[in-house]
Amino acid sequence: MAALTDVQRLQSRVEELERWVYGPGGTRGSRKVADGLVKVQVALGNIASKRERVKILYKKIEDLIKYLDPEYIDRIAIPEASKLQFILAEEQFILSQVALLEQVNALVPVLDSASIKAVPEHAARLQRLAQIHIQQQDQCVAITEESKALLEGYNKTTMLLSKQFVQWDELLCQLEAAKQVKPAEE
């Protein structure tokens, strides 16, 4: 039964191929694709039996397919022992990655929690708070600059007053010294 369905499936595929080749009108005359394929196979068989080099090529097709396989270079270039050594050399890194993946796996319920799922709902509030924070930072910078200017003014005033007091103190000392000297002269 299965062989019959395989034959029917193959027949339908050949008919579809004929429609592709010959168009929707069907086959032209009595030529069918299957007949052409049989003729090509017979011709190739005749050529192969007559030519020794072609026989050798047919035998080496499997080798050619094996060599064309992209993984073939990896199998030849890196022997199994080297692959094993590479894996063993990276053992600590692999184990650390496993531990990290286990931590992520353990935290998956947190990611699936209602709080995390509600984040999009709070995005507008967060954006508004971020704008307020930026405004407050700007205000803080302005207040800092203003405070710095006031402190510089205070320091200048204090320094000028200190210099003035020092000058007055020196003048007072000179006047007191002159006053003490005058009575002694009389």
Swiss-Prot record:
Name positions with the PTM N-acetylalanine: 2
Main localization of the protein described in the UniProt heading = cytoplasm
Compartments, as annotated in UniProt: Cytoplasm; Cytoplasm, Cytoskeleton, Microtubule organizing center, Centrosome; Chromosome, Centromere, Kinetochore; Cytoplasm, Cytoskeleton, Spindle
Query: What are the protein's UniProt keywords?
Result: Acetylation, Cell cycle, Cell division, Centromere, Chromosome, Coiled coil, Cytoplasm, Cytoskeleton, Kinetochore, Mitosis
Matching entries from InterPro entries are given as:
DCTN3
Q: What family is this protein classified in?
A: Belongs to the dynactin subunit 3 family.
Q: How does it assemble?
A: Subunit of dynactin, a multiprotein complex part of a tripartite complex with dynein and a adapter, such as BICDL1, BICD2 or HOOK3. The dynactin complex is built around ACTR1A/ACTB filament and consists of an actin-related filament composed of a shoulder domain, a pointed end and a barbed end. Its length is defined by its flexible shoulder domain. The soulder is composed of 2 DCTN1 subunits, 4 DCTN2 and 2 DCTN3. The 4 DCNT2 (via N-terminus) bind the ACTR1A filament and act as molecular rulers to determine the length. The pointed end is important for binding dynein-dynactin cargo adapters.
Task performed by this protein: Part of the dynactin complex that activates the molecular motor dynein for ultra-processive transport along microtubules. Together with dynein may be involved in spindle assembly and cytokinesis.
- UniProt protein name: Dynactin subunit 3
